[in-house]
């Protein structure tokens, strides 16, 4: 059973429960008024009606319980149906999604599905839901929040250039005379490791966060005339080292692996 099918069934049984509770509450109110007015005949009549309503309440509650127990949420997770519904929802929202179970990249964040414990982690936080629609909505809200956050392209470019220069010096030390100072490309992930040397710091600023900052810098450079505070231009390259996947300002995937400042 898919979650939306379960939800439809549950809401129908819950509606019956809600209506019965409303009836019970109404009869109790009438009985209170009857007692105040001294209308014992009406009080006894409403008391009998309340007994019947309470019996109906038990039946309605049983219906809700049966509806909930009919949904095997563990199987829903482990069978892959939850993942299928989530991916369909992301596609309908036109959200860029790559990866395979249990980890999916929804740039610039990730969704991890823990089938064993029936849990979902969006970014770095657990999302207490088993309804794919709510997860997709939460992912969309997080992406919007990240994309609307302020970004200082100059400050990031300067940090990146500083790391780049350290990598160039390290390369020179290993390969004396073989480094072209004018046009030398350094793997982006080498720069990342220089920028974030401690493993515990990489938990706070991981490669995904780095890729997102690269994407925003990439888009800033696309506008033209971007130079660093030191007066250098920034060039991205491909083909050397592990690629970093980013999305440009049109939503197109770009794979970049190296960088050069000149």
Where are these regions (language model features)?
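Long, compositionally biased intrinsically disordered regions
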Residues: 1-150
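Short glycine-rich, low-complexity/disordered patches
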Residues: 71-84, 88-93, 97-104, 172-186, ...
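Short helix-coil junctions and helix-kink-helix linkers
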Residues: 73-77, 193-204
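Exposed alpha-helical structural elements
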Residues: 138-141, 155, 159, 209
